[in-house]
Design a protein with these regions (language model features):
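Alpha-helix initiation and N-capping motif
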Residues: 53, 98-102, 122, 154
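Short cysteine-rich loop/turn motifs with clustered Cys
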Residues: 22-55, 60, 86
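C-terminal, well-folded lobe of enzymatic/effector domains
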Residues: 114-168
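Short, small-residue-biased leader/transition segments that mark boundaries at the very start
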Residues: 1-6
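Histidine-centered nuclease catalytic patch
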Residues: 46-81, 97
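Short Cys/His-centered divalent metal-binding micro-motifs
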Residues: 78, 82-107
Length: 168
């Protein structure tokens, strides 16, 4: 059964805007099963946010995309652009593009003065990106990178799901 699921959960199955899609829900199940931390929060698990009080956040914020000409709902609401976030982290990010809010996190890794989430060193940041299936170059991405980001994230999400299936 597991290998059959792997065949179905290819990156192209994540080309959807439906949070109810089987592929997206399998990705969330994988994050829960693998005990993944939520984005920018060491110690706050994805499972905590799903069961208690997390927000579904757009990695490239919806208003940022709209202001930059991506105003098609199915384009900005791609599940590859979704991540569960702690409510306070979501509010702190606001409509900032990834290049801005990840620059803040990188700065706090150097200064140790926490202003966004609780990640305080770069190694921890890159591990956190990996467990959330986010490409490492997100730290410098802007609107021109959105389509390539979606493609790369779908591949990383599918890879995490495959790891989940192999561990079942």
């Amino acid at each position: 059964v597991g290998s059959e699921m792997c065949i179905r959960d290819r990156p192209q199955n994540l080309e959807t805007s439906s949070v109810n899609s089987p592929a997206f829900n399998t990705f969330l199940a994988a994050q829960i099963n693998l005990n993944c931390n939520s984005l920018l929060m060491k110690g706050t698990k994805v499972s905590d946010l799903i069961t208690i009080s997390g927000d579904v956040h757009h990695i490239f914020p919806r208003n940022y995309l709209k202001k930059n000409g991506i105003d098609n709902k199915t384009k900005y609401n791609q599940v590859a652009n979704y991540i569960y976030l702690d409510t306070q982290v979501n509010k702190a990010i606001g409509d900032d593009p990834p290049s801005v809010y990840f620059a803040k996190v990188q700065e706090q890794c150097g200064t140790k003065a926490i202003t966004l989430g609780n990640i305080s060193d770069e190694e921890m940041l890159y591990r956190n990106l990996e467990e959330n299936s986010i490409p490492q170059n997100i730290v410098s991405m802007d609107i021109s990178d959105y389509e390539s980001f979606l493609q790369e994230r779908r591949k990383l999400m599918a890879k995490l799901m495959q790891r989940y299936y192999q561990e079942l």
